[in-house]
UniProtKB/Swiss-Prot annotation:
CDD domains: RPI_A (cd01398)
SUPFAM superfamilies: D-ribose-5-phosphate isomerase (RpiA), lid domain, NagB/RpiA/CoA transferase-like
Family per similarity comment: Belongs to the ribose 5-phosphate isomerase family.
Protein name: Ribose-5-phosphate isomerase A
Location of the active site: E110
Length: 230
């Protein structure tokens, strides 16, 4: 599938998600190429239908700047109690709607917005669908003070760690941390791995989004749009 076709699919899925947004909502907005199409569709609804939102929170400066350029005011997560709806993308989505996220490095804020949402919808094209979580490195955000120990421990556990880099340097997250990508593929027991990472000192957050997503909007290459609801 070429990029032009992939972008067309992403745009179709994003427009369907944008039609779920209602005036008066507190909206969570994720990050990534598919979400950029979603934000464009929101802007169109704002202009054509006078869509008015109570508040918007987002997971990246890129999404924030795009929203503000379209006339939306963006709030901080601390300023809201709970989003009515959060729309985001996902790097991989399994049959049971579990996902791997964090390819763009914003996994910690993405998960914080997600857990403070009444409903979570992911928008993807069919290339992101997998039977079980696989085909994409699992991001783990780690504190610099203990990152070397974390890396060695992951090696000992057979998780195939790799430092995420930015040029010839280690990638630094919004919060000043590093990311270790785990190349274990497929992930044999996602809940077990999530529990292990949750209890590992020095791990800030990981990209396993389990039992969180309520609905996935999928754009297929044949032009059809599929809704998968948990």
């Amino acid at each position: 599938m070429d990029k032009k076709e992939q972008d067309r699919l992403k745009k179709e899925a994003a427009e369907k998600a944008a039609n779920m947004v209602q005036s008066g909502m507190i909206l969570g907005v994720g990050t990534g190429s598919t979400v950029a199409f979603f934000i464009d569709a929101l802007g169109k609804r704002k202009d054509e239908e006078d869509l008015k939102l109570k508040a918007i929170v987002t997971t990246s400066n890129r999404s924030k700047k795009q929203l503000e350029s379209l006339g939306f005011e963006v709030s901080e997560l601390a300023d809201i109690d709970q989003a009515d709806l959060t729309v985001d993308g996902s790097d991989r989505v399994a049959d049971n709607l579990d996902g791997i996220k964090g390819g763009g490095g914003a996994l910690t804020l993405e998960k914080n917005v997600a857990i403070n949402s009444k409903k979570i919808v992911w928008i993807v094209d069919e290339s992101k669908l997998v039977h079980r979580l696989s085909g994409f490195p699992l991001p783990v955000e780690v504190l610099p003070i203990s990152c070397e120990q974390n890396f060695r421990r992951f090696e000992q556990e057979g998780l195939k760690p790799q430092w995420r880099t930015d040029g010839d340097k280690r990638y630094i997250t919004h919060y000043g941390n590093y990311i270790i990508d785990l190349a274990v593929d497929p992930i044999p027991a996602p809940h077990g791995l999530a529990d292990y990472l949750d209890h590992t000192v020095g791990v800030v957050e990981h990209g396993l989004f389990l039992d969180m997503c309520d609905e996935v909007i999928i754009a297929h290459s044949d032009g059809t749009i599929e809704d998968k609801i948990k």
